[in-house]
Amino acid sequence: MTSREASQAPLEFGGPLGVAALLILLPATMFHLLLAARSGPARLLALPAYLPGLEELWSPWALLLLFIWLGLQVALYLLPARKVAEGLELKDKSRLRYPINGFQALVLTALLMGLGVSVGLPLGALPGMLLPLAFATTLTSFIFSLLLYAKALVAPASALAPGGNSGNSMYDFFLGRELNPRLGSFDFKYFCELRPGLIGWVFINLALLMQEAELRGSPSLAMWLVNGFQLLYVGDALWYEESVLTTMDIIHDGFGFMLVFGDLAWVPFTYSLQAQFLLYHPQPLGLPMALLICLLKVIGYYIFRGANSQKNTFRKNPSDPSVAGLETIPTATGRQLLVSGWWGMVRHPNYLGDLIMALAWSLPCGLSHLLPYFYVLYFTALLVHREARDEQQCLQKYGRAWQEYCKRVPYRIIPYVY
C-alpha cells in the first residue's frame, strides 16, 4: 500500500477537526463520569460541583502502581501459552502469531490478588485512587501513542493501516498509523486489546465491592450482580481470546490514541461506572427483580455467545455438524456468508446480545439516575457506528454477495426495529 493509496481512504470521525475534538472530549468525559459517580446528585448531564486540582490528579504512587500493573500483565503475556494462533494473512502474505493465554493471565492475576489481600494488600483502598490512576493512565496513553506514531514513521508501507496513513499527523496519531506495531514478537495492540484494561476493570470492580463491604458490613445484592455479570463478560472475552484476531480492531484499525486510550483508560475507568455508582449511591434490590435481571443477562449472553460461536465454528470448519446445514451465499472471495441461524435473524446478532447484557448490568443500579446507563447509551452509539463501518467494509469486500445478504437479512441489530 502506497502513501498515495492510503491518503485516498475516506476520513472517519469528522476528519482532523473531529479527532482533535475527540482527543479532548474522550478524557474529559471519562473524568466527568468519575466525578459524577461520587457526587451527591450523580447527574450525567450536569457539570461537576468542583474540578479537582493538579494536586488531586497527580500522584507518583498512582503512576508507579500503573507501571507495576502493566509490568505484571506483560510478564503474564510472556508466559508459555496453551496455544499459539495465526492471524489473518497480511498484505505481504505473511501471518503473525499470537499467544492465546489471556484467560490464564486472568486466573493468575486473581491468584496473586488473593494472595496479596491475604497478607494485607489494601485492595479496598483502590477506589480512593481512581482519579490519580485515571490521570496517570491518560498521560501514559498520550506518551505511548506518540511513541507508536514515531515508530510508524519508519515502518514499511506494507505495515501501515488502511485508514491511519492520511498524511495528516493529528488524524494519523489518533487512528494509528501502523497496523500491528511489535517489538520482536511482542504485539502491542493485541496485548492492550484484552489484557491490562479488561482485567483491570474486573479488579477495580472487586475493589469497589470490598470498599462497600468495609463501609456497610457486606456488599449489596446489586453490587454482587454487577461484579458477577461483568466478570462473566471479561472471562468470556479472554476464554475466546482467539476470536479477537478477526475483529476490525486487529485486522483493520491502526494502533493509535483511539485504541490505546480506549484499551488502557476508557475501559477500566468508565466500564466500572455501575460499581462506582453503587458504592456512593446504594440502591435497594429485591430478590424477584434480581432474578428477572439475571434472566435478561442469560438471554443476552445466550444470543451473544451463540452468534459468535456459530460464526467462529463456521469459519474454522464449515462441515461441522452444528453449522453444516446452515444456508449460505457464495462470494467472489471464496468465502460463504451465513444467511440462516443467528446470522439470518439480524446482520449483527452478537451486537444485539451485547446490548442486552449492557442493559442487564445497569439495571441493578435502579431507575432513579441516568448516570449508570451511560454505558448503554454510549455502547449503542458505538455499535451503530461500528456496524456502519462493518457494512462499508463488507460491501467493498463482498460486493453483490453482500447486497444479496442485506436483502435477505434486512435488519441490522434489533429485529423489526433497526
Curated annotation (Swiss-Prot):
Pathway(s): Steroid biosynthesis; cholesterol biosynthesis
Ligand binding (NADP(+)): 311, 315, 338, 343, 350-351, 390, 394-398, 405
One Gene Ontology molecular-function label: Delta14-sterol reductase activity
PROSITE patterns assigned: STEROL_REDUCT_1, STEROL_REDUCT_2
Deletion phenotype: Mice develop normally, appear healthy and are fertile.
GO CC, alphabetical: endoplasmic reticulum membrane; organelle membrane; receptor complex
Pfam families in alphabetical order: ERG4_ERG24 (PF01222)
Cystine pairings recorded for this chain: none
InterPro entries (alphabetical): ERG24_DHCR-like, Sterol_reductase_CS
Tissue expression notes: Strongly expressed in liver, weaker in ovary, testis, kidney and brain.
Subcellular location field: Endoplasmic reticulum membrane; Microsome membrane
Protein's GO biological process: cholesterol biosynthetic process
Highest taxon in the source lineage: Eukaryota
EC number: 1.3.1.70
Catalytic activity line of the entry: 4,4-dimethyl-5alpha-cholesta-8,24-dien-3beta-ol + NADP(+) = 4,4-dimethyl-5alpha-cholesta-8,14,24-trien-3beta-ol + NADPH + H(+); 5alpha-cholest-8,14-dien-3beta-ol + NADPH + H(+) = 5alpha-cholest-8-en-3beta-ol + NADP(+); 4,4-dimethyl-8,14-cholestadien-3beta-ol + NADPH + H(+) = 4,4-dimethyl-5alpha-cholest-8-en-3beta-ol + NADP(+)
Membrane disposition: Multi-pass membrane protein
Role, per record: Catalyzes the reduction of the C14-unsaturated bond of lanosterol, as part of the metabolic pathway leading to cholesterol biosynthesis.
Sequence similarity: Belongs to the ERG4/ERG24 family.
Protein name, entry field: Delta(14)-sterol reductase TM7SF2
Organism: Mus musculus (Mouse)
